[in-house]
């Protein structure tokens, strides 16, 4: 037997990979330790080169070829904390919506997009060379009856030229502290053709995509301001350079010319994803276009007043913008409020139930894990949902938000008010299928059915100390009267026949004296047995 030092013990941690990816995603949302900034069409995304190179062949070639991995930013030094000194990539050939969806996929292993944006995501995945996303998008488009778009030759050529130019610039080996590599001009992008509108299909999709309320890690560019004095060429070059001080490697600030000076780097705000929100309000300022300084403002005709008049892709893009980052001085009357609901279903990995709605899958998973994160501060009762806790708090505060419009009654729940309204309207929607008696409340009908009040026959009142009547077995019992019609109000006839049937089946013998007041249909001293009635008639 070997010594304890020679014995190797393997302790597996199955959740380590998912927890590690979750921590990286949290760092991306907060902007911590990000060593790369991706710019596209006026928007910026803070991210990590290692994560992108692990899931995209294009980024792997971009970061490793020509520079041996020591390219674009201070990835090997400790000065890239919080995004300071990070490298910059200009990827204008990839749209912001598709790029945001692919970045979220890289950090969460879940592709979140809309049906209308699926062709754009497929095109971006082809440019960035992400095979698994390409296969998934092709399968969904084919299953939905949509034709997959062919690759855009212009965008493919621009992506190839950018990769070659970047590899050439980083291979030149510019030392730290010197001027940045020569800017390699790229051909201007062609005017975008009119985008075809994808037809929505009613066929079921083969894959379940998670939909979240908002995209995280969107950085809204600041509003461009006119400086007090014109900037010289050197000042513009210094202002547009990122990571020139801090021990960065060669090729730190390489970016194709965009025609305008880059906005100064500063602290950026991030919007973490809140899974409990079922829907959220999107505030959009008409005077600022898509984003502050991100593009020309839209005309009132393009904005419109009807929600259907706005492109759903535009609404999905606006969902990534937080209202705190948009024009803080605007009044509420100048803001356009939009609500976006989830479209893609999600499947529970435990019970395989299909969950609809953003953020509802984590709430459903609490039914399997038993987690109850919402606790009452008064009595300590815990709940799995926040809305249930709010309803519970009404018991402590005495709040009754549902009031009757016809009387001063107030109720704790909406269904109590609905049942109460039947008293004013006279509706009796709950009907017994045996006697067709209607009730205003469902619990009244259930009580009626459990007690069998509709078929119960009482020939006379019986005291507690009376012996129960003797019922003969079914073999010796007399045949029940045939030909009874229980329809058209013949229920009383059936009850009378049933009473006579039990009287004939009862054993003969002296009647049991029942002291007390007589029945309502009997007179004082009246006979109570058939023998007595016959004796009186004969006399």
UniProtKB/Swiss-Prot annotation:
Residues 34-115 form the BTB domain. Residues 171-308, 458-486, 501-539 are annotated as: Disordered. Keywords: Acetylation, Developmental protein, Differentiation, DNA-binding, Isopeptide bond, Metal-binding, Nucleus, Phosphoprotein, Repeat, Repressor, Transcription, Transcription regulation, Ubl conjugation, Zinc, Zinc-finger. One of its GO terms (cellular component) is nucleoplasm. It is found in: Nucleus. InterPro entries: BTB/POZ_dom, SKP1/BTB/POZ_sf, Znf_C2H2_sf, Znf_C2H2_type, ZnFinger_BTB_dom_contain. Residues 273-282 have a biased composition (Acidic residues). One of its GO terms (molecular function) is zinc ion binding. The modification Phosphothreonine is found at residue 369. It comes from the Eukaryota. One of its GO terms (biological process) is positive regulation of insulin receptor signaling pathway. Residues 197-206 have a biased composition (Basic residues). Transcription regulator that acts as a key regulator of lineage commitment of immature T-cell precursors. Exerts distinct biological functions in the mammary epithelial cells and T cells in a tissue-specific manner. Necessary and sufficient for commitment of CD4 lineage, while its absence causes CD8 commitment. Development of immature T-cell precursors (thymocytes) to either the CD4 helper or CD8 killer T-cell lineages correlates precisely with their T-cell receptor specificity for major histocompatibility complex class II or class I molecules, respectively. Homodimerizes. Interacts with NCL, NEDD4 and YBX1. Interacts with HNRNPU (via RNA-binding RGG-box region); the interaction facilitates the recruitment of long non-coding RNA Blnc1 by ZBTB7B. Interacts with HDAC4 and HDAC5; the interaction allows the recruitment of HDAC4 and HDAC5 on CD8 loci for deacetylation and possible inhibition of CD8 genes expression. This is Zinc finger and BTB domain-containing protein 7B.
